[in-house]
Amino acid sequence: MEDEQIVGCNGFYARHTLKRFLDAQSRLKRSRLALYPLPAHLWLDHIRCVGLETLDVALERRDISVSSFHPQSFQYSLFEGTKTSQGRWTAAYYRRCVDTAAALGCSTLCIEPAGSLLDRSPQEQWRNLVEQVAGLCAYARQHGVQVCVQTVTRAESGLLRTLEELLRLLEEVPDACAVLDTVPASQAGESISLWFSALGEKIRHVRFRDGRTDGGRIWGEGVYPFHSYGAQLLEVPYTGTVSLCGV
């Protein structure tokens, strides 16, 4: 793996200014970012995007680019069908995320479909997920953006928690690609080697995180076997990007 594959990430900079985050990336010599639209850095919802011009100027000044854009679900749910208000606003939000990624010169949109309901039919919610992701892929393709989907943890959702479910989704929505997040993969008992064996070049980004049963951590604050995970990642022929949350 090359050093340039390891990209900076603002995931743990939610309570720091954009300047503080970008200054840190410059010191670490990170020229590419996995960027989350955190309110302190970029405001983004289904109605508007605020701060894009400021962000773009700040990135250009430091010669930093965005390699992947990671919108969080917040109050939106890809498990809602487009016949409901929440479902329509969700679709609008993710389309705006595509627009924002394209405006930043970023061709990879990574989504984490959290928020399935426990007391609603899993079959219905799965159909809604397929509809939403397929529609988003079609829209993103028009803007030169690739949609990538990751699994989520038990605390985040009752669906799409395993590699098996993700494989099913990618079979039903072949235009989508994958993100490997070590936290939900670990909770599901899945290895990095297993993921690459199943998905290969479909994996476009790796969120290489430490964690505990209650979620992700900066490396050293969780319980995951760093050396084992690192060795597995080095063994696979992966040329995509890797984000280390907290860097």
Predicted regions and their residues:
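Alpha-helix initiation/capping motif
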Residues: 45-48, 83, 122, 159, ...
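Active-site acidic/histidine proton-transfer and metal-coordination neighborhood
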Residues: 20, 61, 78-177, 187
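Residues at or immediately flanking beta-strands
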Residues: 32, 65, 144-148, 177, ...
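Active-site-proximal flexible loops/turns
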Residues: 17, 41-43, 75-77, 119, ...
